[in-house]
C-alpha cells in the first residue's frame, strides 16, 4: 500500500519547531488553536480580516494569489502572514476547498469592547470539499455529496452512506454477496462524491482499488474513527425510539456507516444544527444495475465539474428548476425496475404531452420557483438572509398558483401533494414582516417592514429625527461661518464631524474643536453635533439588534415547518421532470414506449438520442431491432466507422429512457423490464492499473458472464481484437456460445471476425445482421442501415481513405491486398492439392513455385507482418503508422 503524506503532516513538524514561550499572547492563542487543527488551513479572525500564519500563509499566498507579508520578528524568526477581508472570505474558502484543502474558521466569540485582555476565539466550523454550506459556491444543478464506505470481508458486505448537507438528503444502502465490491464501485461512480470517508478498519486492498477507479473525480479521501454504539448514537441524534423507523433493523454495517458519516459532519459543524430529519434506506435491488463501464460507455451523465453536452443528461435536461435538474441526474443513473413506478411516471408524462397548453403554463410557473431545497438548508444552518426569505415567499406563491391550476385536473392533481395551509402561513408571515427591498446583510437593518413592530418604529423615528437635525446643523453652520463647502460626514473612528477645506480654515469659529488634520482639510466637532450623534448611533445600534432579533424569530418559526419545505421541493422536482419529459418528447419527436413484463424487445425507427442532438436535424439514419425468444442474440458485422457502436448504444440508451419513465427516441417501441445493462465497447489500456487492452477486456467480459441474467441486455463490441486473430476468434466464439447457451441474455455482439457469422447456423437463437455498404465504382458509401445477413468485407482501406491517409499509401495498400488475396486463394488451392497428392499430379510443387514468383523477399516480410497484424482492430492513425512501416520495408528499408 502506498504511503500518502499530506501537506498538513509536513506543516505539523514545522509548527512544533516554534517555541510558544517566545510569542505574544495573540500568537500563543493562535498556536494553541492551531495544534488542534493541524490538518486544516486555519483562518484566524483579527478585526476585519481573517489572517493565516506560517505554512498556512504560504499555501494561501500560492493558491489564492495573496501577498505574503511578514509579522514582527521574534528571536530572529519571521512569521509569514497572509489575510483576506472577512466580508469576502466565502469566495476564498471555496477556492481552497475546490483545490482539496480543508479550512478551519476561527472567529472572535466575544465583543472586543467588553473583552478583558485578549479577545476569546474559537473554531466555529471546519469546511471540507463535502461540507460546504455556502450554496453560492456550488453548482446549482448538481448535488455536492460526501460519502462514507465500510466493508465486511467476512460476510462480503459493503455499506455506503451519503448526503448533501445543503439539501438534507441522507441515504444509506448495503450490497451483499458475489461481486459486492464491484457493485459498490458502480454505485460510488453514480454518487460522484467530492469527499469519501473511510473507516480505520477498511481493508487497504479495497481502498486502493477504490482510489484507482474513481480518482478521476478529484475526490478527497478522509480516514475517520468508528463511532461506538452507533445505533444508540443515531437514535439519540434523531430522537427516535428505534432505528427500525428508518428500516435499518439488523443492518449493522449500514447503521455503523451512517453513524460515522453523521458524526464527522456534526464534529465539523461544531454543534450547529444540521438539516437531517431522517435516514433513507435505499433498496438498490429495485434499481437497474449499471456498472462503471456501462455508465461511462453510454455517456449517461457528465463527470464532476464537466458540462452536460454530449451526455444523455444534456439531451433530457430542459428542466426549469434547480431541484428538477438535480433529481433528473439521479434518476438517469438509477432507472426503475418497478413497473408500477415506471408506468406512474409515464402516465404523468403522457398527460402533459397531450395537453400542450397546461404543460407550457406549468413550466412558466415553475420558472419563477427558486431553489427551495437549498433555501431550507440555509435556514437550518442560520445562513439565510432577507433575499432568501423573499425568494421563498415568491416560490410559495408560484407553487400555490400551480397547485390551484392542477387541482382542476383530477387525474394528476396528486402530483403536487403539498402542505397548503402551512405554506400559506409561511407566505403570509414573510409578506407581513420582510421588507421587499431587504438587503443581503442581516446585521445592518432595513429587513423588517415599517408598522410590524412598534418599538422598531419608535427607534426609526428617533434615528430619522436625529439625522434630520444633523442636516439642520450642517445648514446652520454654513450660514454662520460663510463656508459654502462645509460638510458634516461620518466614519466609524470619529463618528460625525465637520469637514472644512484648507482654503476656508481662516473662517472657522473659535468654538470648533479640532479632531483631525488632513492634507487638504481639517475636521472639527461641536457640542450639539456630538449630542445628536449619540442619539442617532444609539438608535441605529438598537434598530439593527432588534431587526436581527425579529428576523431570527421569523426564521425560527419557519424552521419548525422545514419538512414541509423539503416536501415542496421534492414535489416541484417531480413535476418539473415529468413536464420536462413531455416537453423533450415533443421537441425531439420521441414516442411513448410500451413497457412490460414480456420478453420482446422491439424498437422501430430507433435513434441514438445523444448523436442525434449533435448533428443537423433529420439527418440521423433510423434503424430497427427485435429480440425475442426466437432470436435474442445478434451477431453484427460491418466496417469500422460504419455505425455499429452507435446502433448498439442507441438500443441501450432507449432501454434506460423507458425505465426512467421517459419517452424514447424511436417511431415505436416495446421494451421489457431489463435488470442489468452491460457494455464492453472500445479498446484502451488502463494506465492506472497497468492492465493491457486485452487484459482489461477479458476482465470486463468475465464480470459480464458472471453477473448477467436472462433479463439483462449485453453490448459487446469487437471482443478478442486485443490478441492474435485465431485466439480472438476462438475467444469470441466461446463467449458468444456461453451467452447463448448458459445466460440467455438479449445481446448484440459486434465483430470484425466474419467467421462468427457461421454461428447463426449452430446457435438456435443467433441471427446475423450487418451495416449496409454501397459500392459505387472505386468508392464505398456507408449507409448506416442495419440489415439482415453477415458482411463479407471489412473495407479497411476505404476507412483509411476516409480518415485522410495519403493516396500513395492507399494505392500501395490495394496492391498488397490483391497479393494477399491471391495468396489466400493459393493457400486454399494448396489445401485442395494436398488432398489430391494421393493421385500424384504434382500440384503442390507447382503452387509453391507460383507463390515464390509472386512475392519478393521484402514482400514476403511484409506478408509475414500482415499475417500477424489485426488490421480491423487498428485506429486510422495506427493504420497510417503501420502502412508507413510496411512501405519502408517494401522499398528496401527495414522494420527496425
Swiss-Prot record:
Pfam families referenced in this protein's UniProt entry, alphabetically: MutS_I, MutS_II, MutS_III, MutS_IV, MutS_V
Mention any one GO cellular component term assigned to this protein in its UniProt record: cytosol
Give this protein's Gene Ontology molecular function annotations.
ATP binding; ATP-dependent DNA damage sensor activity; damaged DNA binding; mismatched DNA binding
Q: Give the GO terms filed under biological process for this record.
A: mismatch repair
Q: Write down what this protein is called.
A: DNA mismatch repair protein MutS
Q: What Gene3D superfamilies does the annotation carry?
A: 1.10.1420.10, DNA repair protein MutS, domain I, MutS, connector domain, P-loop containing nucleotide triphosphate hydrolases
Q: Which domain of life is it from?
A: Bacteria
Q: Which organism is it from?
A: Fusobacterium nucleatum subsp. nucleatum (strain ATCC 25586 / DSM 15643 / BCRC 10681 / CIP 101130 / JCM 8532 / KCTC 2640 / LMG 13131 / VPI 4355)
Binding-site residues for ATP, renumbered to this chain: 638-645
| Assigned protein family | Belongs to the DNA mismatch repair MutS family.
Please spell out the taxonomic lineage of the organism that makes this protein.
Bacteria, Fusobacteriati, Fusobacteriota, Fusobacteriia, Fusobacteriales
Keywords of this protein's UniProt record, alphabetized?
A: ATP-binding, DNA damage, DNA repair, DNA-binding, Nucleotide-binding
Role played: This protein is involved in the repair of mismatches in DNA. It is possible that it carries out the mismatch recognition step. This protein has a weak ATPase activity.
Amino acid at each position: 500500500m502506498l504511503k500518502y503524506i499530506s501537506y498538513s503532516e509536513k506543516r505539523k513538524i514545522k509548527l512544533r519547531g516554534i517555541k510558544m514561550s517566545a510569542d505574544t499572547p495573540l500568537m500563543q492563542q493562535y498556536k494553541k488553536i492551531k495544534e488542534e487543527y493541524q490538518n486544516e488551513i486555519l483562518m484566524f479572525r483579527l478585526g476585519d480580516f481573517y489572517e493565516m500564519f506560517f505554512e498556512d500563509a504560504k499555501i494561501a499566498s500560492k493558491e489564492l494569489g495573496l501577498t505574503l507579508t511578514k509579522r514582527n520578528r521574534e528571536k530572529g524568526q519571521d512569521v509569514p502572514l497572509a489575510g483576506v477581508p472577512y466580508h469576502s472570505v466565502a469566495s476564498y474558502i471555496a477556492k481552497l476547498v475546490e483545490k482539496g484543502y480543508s479550512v478551519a474558521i476561527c472567529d472572535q466569540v466575544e465583543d472586543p469592547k467588553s473583552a478583558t485582555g485578549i479577545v476569546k476565539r474559537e473554531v466555529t466550523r471546519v469546511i471540507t470539499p463535502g461540507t460546504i454550506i455556502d450554496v453560492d459556491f456550488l453548482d446549482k444543478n448538481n448535488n455536492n455529496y460526501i460519502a462514507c464506505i465500510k466493508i465486511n470481508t467476512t460476510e462480503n458486505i459493503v455499506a455506503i452512506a451519503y448526503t448533501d448537507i445543503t439539501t438534507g438528503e441522507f441515504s444509506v444502502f448495503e450490497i451483499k454477496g458475489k461481486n459486492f465490491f464491484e457493485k459498490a464501485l458502480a454505485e460510488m461512480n453514480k454518487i460522484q462524491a467530492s469527499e469519501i470517508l473511510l473507516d480505520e478498519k477498511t481493508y487497504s486492498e479495497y481502498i486502493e482499488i477504490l482510489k484507482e477507479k474513481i480518482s478521476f473525480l478529484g475526490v478527497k479521501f478522509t480516514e475517520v474513527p468508528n463511532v461506538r454504539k452507533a445505533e444508540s448514537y443515531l437514535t439519540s441524534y434523531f430522537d427516535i425510539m428505534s432505528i427500525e423507523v428508518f428500516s435499518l433493523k439488523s443492518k449493522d454495517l449500514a447503521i455503523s456507516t451512517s453513524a460515522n458519516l453523521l458524526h464527522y459532519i456534526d464534529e465539523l459543524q461544531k454543534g450547529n444544527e444540521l438539516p437531517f430529519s431522517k435516514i433513507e434506506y435505499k433498496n438498490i435491488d429495485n434499481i437497474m444495475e449499471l456498472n462503471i463501464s456501462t455508465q461511462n460507455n453510454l455517456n449517461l451523465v457528465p463527470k464532476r465539474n464537466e458540462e452536460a453536452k454530449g451526455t444523455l443528461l444534456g439531451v433530457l435536461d430542459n428542466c426549469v428548476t434547480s431541484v428538477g435538474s438535480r433529481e433528473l441526474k439521479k434518476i438517469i443513473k438509477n432507472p426503475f425496475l418497478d413497473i408500477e413506478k415506471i408506468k406512474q411516471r409515464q402516465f404523468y408524462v403522457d398527460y402533459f404531452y397531450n395537453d400542450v397548453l397546461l404543460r407550457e403554463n406549468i413550466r412558466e410557473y415553475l420558472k419563477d420557483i427558486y431553489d427551495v431545497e437549498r433555501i431550507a438548508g440555509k435556514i437550518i444552518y442560520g445562513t439565510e438572509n432577507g433575499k432568501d426569505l423573499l425568494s421563498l415567499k415568491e416560490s410559495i406563491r408560484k407553487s400555490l398558483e400551480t397547485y390551484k391550476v392542477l387541482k382542476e385536473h383530477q387525474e394528476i392533481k396528486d402530483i403536487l401533494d403539498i402542505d397548503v395551509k402551512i405554506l400559506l402561513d409561511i407566505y403570509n408571515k414573510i409578506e407581513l414582516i420582510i421588507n421587499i427591498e431587504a438587503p443581503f446583510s442581516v446585521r445592518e437593518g432595513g429587513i423588517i417592514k415599517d408598522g410590524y413592530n412598534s418599538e422598531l418604529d419608535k427607534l426609526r423615528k428617533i434615528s430619522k429625527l436625529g439625522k434630520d437635525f444633523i442636516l439642520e446643523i450642517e445648514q446652520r453652520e454654513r450660514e454662520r461661518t460663510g463656508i459654502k463647502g462645509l460638510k458634516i460626514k461620518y466614519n466609524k473612528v470619529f463618528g460625525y464631524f465637520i469637514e472644512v477645506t484648507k482654503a476656508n480654515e481662516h473662517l472657522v469659529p473659535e468654538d470648533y474643536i479640532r479632531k483631525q488634520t488632513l492634507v487638504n482639510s481639517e475636521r472639527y466637532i461641536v457640542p450639539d453635533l456630538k449630542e445628536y450623534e449619540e442619539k442617532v448611533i444609539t438608535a441605529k445600534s438598537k434598530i439593527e439588534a432588534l431587526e436581527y432579533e425579529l428576523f431570527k424569530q421569523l426564521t425560527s418559526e419557519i424552521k419548525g415547518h422545514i419538512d414541509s419545505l423539503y416536501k415542496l421541493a421534492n414535489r416541484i422536482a417531480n413535476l418539473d421532470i415529468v413536464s420536462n419529459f413531455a416537453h423533450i418528447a415533443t421537441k425531439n419527436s420521441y414516442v411513448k414506449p410500451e413497457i412490460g413484463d414480456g420478453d420482446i424487445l422491439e424498437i422501430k425507427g430507433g435513434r441514438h438520442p445523444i448523436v442525434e442532438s449533435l448533428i443537423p436535424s433529420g439527418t440521423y439514419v433510423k434503424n430497427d431491432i427485435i429480440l425475442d425468444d426466437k432470436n435474442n442474440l445478434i451477431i453484427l458485422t460491418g466496417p469500422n466507422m460504419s455505425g455499429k457502436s452507435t446502433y448498439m448504444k442507441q438500443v441501450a440508451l432507449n432501454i434506460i429512457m423507458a425505465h426512467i419513465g421517459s419517452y424514447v427516441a424511436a417511431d415505436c417501441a416495446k421494451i421489457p423490464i431489463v435488470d442489468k445493462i452491460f457494455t464492453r465497447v472500445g479498446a484502451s489500456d488502463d494506465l492506472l492499473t497497468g492492465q493491457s487492452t486485452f487484459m482489461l477486456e477479458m476482465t470486463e467480459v468475465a464480470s459480464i458472464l458472471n453477473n448477467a441474467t436472462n433479463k439483462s441486455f449485453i453490448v459487446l463490441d469487437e471482443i478478442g481484437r486485443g490478441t492474435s486473430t485465431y485466439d480472438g476468434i476462438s475467444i469470441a466464439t466461446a463467449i458468444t456460445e456461453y451467452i447463448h447457451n448458459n445466460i440467455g441474455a438479449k445481446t448484440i455482439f459486434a465483430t470484425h471476425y466474419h467467421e462468427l457469422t457461421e454461428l447463426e447456423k449452430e446457435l438456435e437463437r443467433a441471427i446475423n445482421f450487418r451495416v449496409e455498404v454501397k459500392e459505387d465504382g472505386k468508392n464505398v458509401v456507408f449507409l448506416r442501415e442495419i440489415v439482415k445477413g453477415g458482411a463479407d468485407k471489412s473495407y479497411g482501406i476505404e476507412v483509411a481513405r476516409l480518415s485522410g491517409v495519403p493516396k500513395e499509401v492507399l494505392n500501395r495498400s490495394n496492391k498488397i491486398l490483391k497479393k494477399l488475396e491471391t495468396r489466400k486463394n493459393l493457400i486454399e488451392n494448396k489445401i485442395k492439392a494436398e488432398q489430391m497428392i494421393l493421385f500424384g499430379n504434382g500440384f503442390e510443387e507447382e503452387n509453391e513455385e507460383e507463390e515464390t514468383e509472386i512475392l519478393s523477399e521484402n514482400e514476403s516480410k511484409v506478408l509475414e507482418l500482415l499475417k500477424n497484424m489485426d488490421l480491423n482492430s487498428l485506429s486510422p492513425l495506427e493504420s497510417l503508422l503501420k502502412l508507413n512501416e510496411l512501405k519502408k520495408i517494401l522499398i528496401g528499408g527495414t522494420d527496425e
